[in-house]
Amino acid sequence: MKLYMTTMSGNSFKVRVLASILDIPIEEVHIDWDNREHKSPAFLDRNPRGQVPVMDIEGRTFWDSTAHLVYLARTHGGEDWLPSDPLDMAEVMQWMSFAQDEVQFGLMWARGVTIYGRRPESFQGYLDDSHTALELLTWQLRKTGDWLALGRPTLAEIACYPYVK
């Protein structure tokens, strides 16, 4: 199993965190982001979106960190990280969607402005979205205690963690 990634990518980080917790060996293939390797023809053959992470599993390529987390959890984590009960799964998945929406389009993009200087004209919007994301996380944790879903660690925490930490 190969993970095409960068160390600065929160989406790459969340996959690496779960793989580490589950003691899954992954070959990390570091992509040279600064030299735009992610836009090279060879990389675009793996992911036409030109983004990391990309995971190669037995010759099949998947280019979304949520897909990676689901695969790792279902193949190596039993019921612990992503339960098969439909209601429990829905509770976890809503927070995984939240991570790919409010967290990503707020906290991740605000981080991109502050660290990389990307799209500084949009910073206030990203900051506003970040506040909304943090307010929703705070609201949920006030209700549930230490965990976003099911009263225990799940993929919900792994999905949100990189940009909230």
What are these regions (language model features)?
Residues 96-165:
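GST-like fold's C-terminal all-alpha helical module
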Residues 76-80, 90-98, 102:
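Helix-loop-strand module that forms the ligand-binding subsite of alpha/beta enzymes
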Residues 76-85, 116-123:
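Short, polar/flexible loop-turn hinges at active-site or ligand-entry regions and domain interfaces
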Residues 45, 83, 160:
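Phosphate-coordinating loops and pocket residues in cytosolic domains that bind phosphorylated ligands
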Residues 66-74:
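A basic- and aromatic-enriched beta-loop-alpha substructure that forms the phosphate/nucleotide-
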Residues 43, 80-82, 147-148:
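Short clusters of hydrophobic/aromatic residues that line enzyme substrate/ligand-binding pockets
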Residues 1-66, 89, 121-125:
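N-terminal G-site of the GST-like fold
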